[in-house]
Swiss-Prot record:
GO terms for biological process: nicotianamine biosynthetic process. This is Probable nicotianamine synthase 3. It comes from Hordeum vulgare. It is an enzyme of class 2 (transferase). The keyword S-adenosyl-L-methionine applies. Synthesizes nicotianamine, a polyamine that is the first intermediate in the synthesis of the phytosiderophores of the mugineic acid type found in gramineae which serves as a sensor for the physiological iron status within the plant, and/or might be involved in the transport of iron. It holds the Pfam family NAS. It catalyses: 3 S-adenosyl-L-methionine = nicotianamine + 3 S-methyl-5'-thioadenosine + 3 H(+). InterPro entries: Nicotian_synth, SAM-dependent_MTases_sf. Belongs to the nicotianamine synthase (NAS)-like family.
Length: 335
């Protein structure tokens, strides 16, 4: 009976999302407007609650709809961020007014979660330099991390769009602390090579590489050029939230030369899942590792997945094995 109810719930959800996709696709523009805001609010409201749906197992027609919807979400998100970035730039000190962005608190909570996961699972000194790939015109994540959690760290923000970087840089013009630690670069991650080796942590935005194969290529490229021991933070999605953002398979992260240390699926207003991984020193040419090597091949569902609340004690028990359990349990918070 439960399975039957789940199937009905999934079918109803897919039908609703399909209708919203059709309505959004008919909009003359995805720039912020009452109609755009109303439809995307309805979409997010439908996707955020816990759901039994596994979007990776939907049929071809639903998959095509989902892929198109994610592209629309990406375009709308870019226009929304550009709109608010321009609004903020009109202030003498834009960083004093970030709260006008309606989802700013979500970035605060997401960045806090990512910081705490890094602190618990990556045993190293405070990072000297961090890269954020896909920073966009509103680099809230870098700002929150720099201002609240990593006061001495330098941040290099990368985006394909030069206009997005121009907008972002204007937000920091009046700040002599965080602004001095922020730099913006217009580049495709595929064109970065030796630069990647200087970062202690690399953040990969959810919409960099929207198709699964593109995301896997980006991760493999990072694995080929990041320094051994450097951390990778990947934003993904879970359940119905996979209609909004791409879902990253931890196997692709393992095949890319990383060891997956933890996965967290929030069930609150933080929409993105977070995957913490570390570049392994024990990766062979075929992408496979040994011992704790990054190439460990995880079957779907056997990766250290932690459902909310993301309690670190439970995460340690899930992630570690044998003597590593004690090593992580006794580790000091380094970040």
């Amino acid at each position: 009976m439960a399975a039957q109810n789940n199937n009905k719930d999934v079918a109803a959800l897919v039908e609703k999302i399909t209708g919203l996709h059709a309505a959004i696709a008919k909009l003359p523009s995805l720039s912020p407007s009452p109609d755009v805001d109303a439809l995307f609010t309805e979409l997010v409201t439908a996707c955020v609650p816990p759901s039994p749906v596994d979007v990776t197992k939907l049929g071809p027609e639903a998959q095509e709809m989902r892929e198109g919807l994610i592209r629309l979400c990406s375009e709308a998100e870019g226009k929304l961020e550009a709109h608010y970035s321009d609004m903020l730039a009109a202030f003498d000190n834009p960083l004093d007014h970030l709260g006008i962005f309606p989802y700013y608190s979500n970035y605060i909570n997401l960045s806090k979660l990512e910081y705490e996961l890094l602190a618990r699972y990556v045993r190293r000194h405070r990072p000297a330099r961090v890269a954020f790939i896909g920073s966009g015109p509103l680099p809230f994540s870098s700002f929150v991390l720099a201002a609240r959690h990593l006061p001495d760290t330098m941040f290099d923000n990368y985006d394909l769009c030069g206009a997005a970087n121009d907008r972002a840089s204007k937000l920091f013009r009046a700040d002599t602390d965080v602004g001095a630690r922020m730099s913006f670069h217009t580049a495709d991650v595929a064109d970065l090579a030796s630069e990647l080796a200087k970062y202690d942590v690399v953040f990969l935005a959810a919409l960099v590489g929207m198709a699964a194969e593109d995301k896997a290529k980006v991760i493999a490229h990072l694995g080929a050029h990041m320094a051994d021991g450097a951390a990778l933070v990947v934003r993904s999605a879970h359940g119905a939230r996979g209609f909004l953002y791409p879902i990253v398979d931890p196997q692709d992260i393992g095949r890319g030369g990383f060891e997956v240390l933890a996965v967290c699926h929030p069930d609150d207003d933080v929409v993105n899942s977070v995957i913490i991984a570390q570049k392994s020193k024990e990766v062979h040419a075929d992408g496979l590792g040994s011992a704790r090597g990054a190439g460990r091949q995880y079957a779907r569902g056997t990766v250290p997945v932690v459902s909310p609340p993301c309690r670190f004690g439970e995460m340690v028990a899930d992630v570690t094995q044998n003597h590593k359990r004690d090593e992580f349990a006794n580790a000091e918070v380094a970040f």
